[in-house]
């Protein structure tokens, strides 16, 4: 009976010692949070393991995550996966549908990234356009008009300059045949008669003013169809056109004239652009929006993935994943880290404590046997 009591007593003592030892060991992982000193000597095991090695742990966790978990290869594979493609494409489609549904304008879109497009156009647009036009004038002012125009436009004008004769003569004939033309001829005759006095009075003895006006009108109309008159008009137009093409830009417009045109044009362009910026994009560019919804989402998703893949290494270096994780862990309160680890490994820590009690009890059992037989 005495021997049984000794064994039980040793088992209980061993279990208590083993269990409490493990509990203390687990607590010493976290506590104390700061070192303690007796006089100038630091108390051993202060601070606890995790507070003491906190920076090293943070560095190691960051290294492990960067080198073995969130690696460049793994992220690249995920980016190129079908799920990523579908997710990015779906997001683009949602934004495009919102663009159509909400009737968003360019101004509303740019305002979402804190850009006032109207203000930008007014403050920078005028100056930029005028500056570009003036730079163009300075660079090309000695060149001929023909050399400045696109070759296709010059070719088109060369081929159709003769058509100007038909157009001009047709317009002149229509004007002369109209009531306005008749009235203008009569008005000019009245002025002419008033200025010439007696000479015209003698002429009116043979013809009335109306007959004279009618005769002049008929002759002018006939001239618009006369081959010689048309040849003269064609020659004049061709010569003027050729002179215009061969004229340097600075002879057609001097610097002050061009500057005035540039300023007026820049104001017109920016004002027009500001008005257009307030119109819904779907109204302003319906075909472009259809293209965006139909084809661009897939192409844009591929482009985004491709560019991310190409620049992933640079991005990861800029992000500095290891440093970011290390910084974040070092900002955590030690209480929070303790709570986090206990929540994650609560079951395992309890098993460790239980194992301490069990091993302590087993050791106590053998110590009891030794105490009895020795």
Swiss-Prot record:
Keyword Lipid biosynthesis (UniProt): no
Any Pfam family the entry gives: DUF445
InterPro entries per the UniProt record, alphabetical: DUF445 (IPR007383), UCP032178 (IPR016991)
Chain ranges passing through the membrane: 4-24, 354-374
Keywords from the UniProt entry: Cell membrane, Membrane, Transmembrane, Transmembrane helix
Topology with respect to the bilayer: Multi-pass membrane protein
Subcellular location: Cell membrane
UniProt key word Membrane: yes
Family stated for the protein in its record: Belongs to the UPF0754 family.
Protein name: UPF0754 membrane protein SAB1779c
Species the sequence originates in: Staphylococcus aureus (strain bovine RF122 / ET3-1)
